Amino acid sequence: MPVPGRFDKLFRRIEQYRDEMVDLQMRLCAIPAIAPSSGGEGEAKKADFLAEWLKDNGFVDVSLIKAPDLDAPDGYRPNGLAYFRGKSSARTTWIMTHTDVVPPGEMSLWKGHPFKAWVEKGKVFGRGVEDNQQDMVASLFAVKALRAEGIEPNCDIGIALVADEETGSRKGIDYVLQNHKVFRRQDLIVVPDAGNEHGTMIEVAEKSILWLKFKTIGKQAHGSTPEKGINSFKAASFFIAALNDLYKIYPAKDKLFDPPISTFEPTKKEANVPNVNTIPGEDVFFMDSRILPQVEVRDVEKTIQKIAAGIERKFKVKIHAEVQQKALAAPPTSAEAPVVQALKKAVRTVYGKDAKAMGIGGGTVAAVFRRAGFPAACWSKLDETAHQPNEYCIIDNMIGDAKVYGHIFLQE
């Protein structure tokens, strides 16, 4: 545990940086870092700005790992790395955040300009201010406070500012892990890519994801003579109802997750015929399944095929299934892993709450680390406004999270 006096000094220094932290948020927000595939120019300008900031504020070995991308104006996507050296280099404590942001969406839904951040009632508003700049700024100022107080951490601190998180990470942390030996098994790796409003969730595991598109093909006919057609919509509706049996077929529970079960939900529905008096000959819907790690995804797919075959026989239709996304659950990080225990200690000290290791249904970039054998943990204190119009960061969360990182940096 950190010496109370050093920790108190660090706390006070971080609090003094409140205005500077908000200012950095606003400057970062003014540099849209949208992926080329989403209509943007990528993260190069933002990465260059951050590299200069890091050098000006005492970080060393600042570098950019450039993932080739011909769609980006500069031909690459930048992944920034920087260090603050401690007493020992035997281990590095990493905070990894991402520099890219999603597009603002419908502009009319914003109260202000999404890339001209504004402050209102203790919050910074703008695209990217919570996802992921809140904890990016928090981690940077935790280190800046250490330097200002002349406190040397026990081990090295690493800051990773990666690209392409919002569109798959192939040009981001995936590329870094595949092409460079940056991380080590003994390192502590914190990824602020998930959290809750209380700061009590440490994400250590994820469910498998299976998104399927189903096209049901029947025979179109006039609405007054349904016997001359085969109603694809009706067959698809019975199919959807039959798919609900997946909950009974796969009833396993795991208390690590919330909800503790596998979920199988029909979601998107495409329009079929445009008029009321036509029996549709084709119908399309999608299903989003989040499957517990102990359940074999391939087994679920086979069960769905059997259910579809039954509907085909009963209604004389054809059902085509197409995988939209399939991601098998990564090996979980142990709830006893050093990074989890470090976060628990820090959260208890800073927020006065008992955080616990949990699993979630959605995918996080920490899964990339876990598949590579690194026990990463996701944590942050968020209001979960990411990707929404009027996205905001609660300034007190940014300050508090900086203290959490500072606490971890000073732990033995």
Which residue stretches match the model-derived regions?
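Metal-dependent amide/peptide-bond hydrolase catalytic core
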Residues: 1-9, 16, 33, 71, ...
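Acidic/His- and Gly-rich active-site-bordering loop/insert found
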Residues: 2-125, 148-153
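A structural signal for isolated positions on well-ordered beta-strands in alpha/beta enzyme cores
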Residues: 63, 94, 158-160, 320
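Short, solvent-exposed loop/turn segments at the edges of secondary structure
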Residues: 77, 112, 154, 185, ...
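Structural motif
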Residues: 91-94, 123, 158, 187-189, ...
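Short beta-strand segments
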Residues: 96-98, 160-162, 190-193, 217, ...
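Glycine/serine-rich anion-binding loops at beta->alpha junctions
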Residues: 122-137, 222
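Acidic/histidine-rich catalytic neighborhood of metal-dependent amide-processing enzymes
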Residues: 130-205
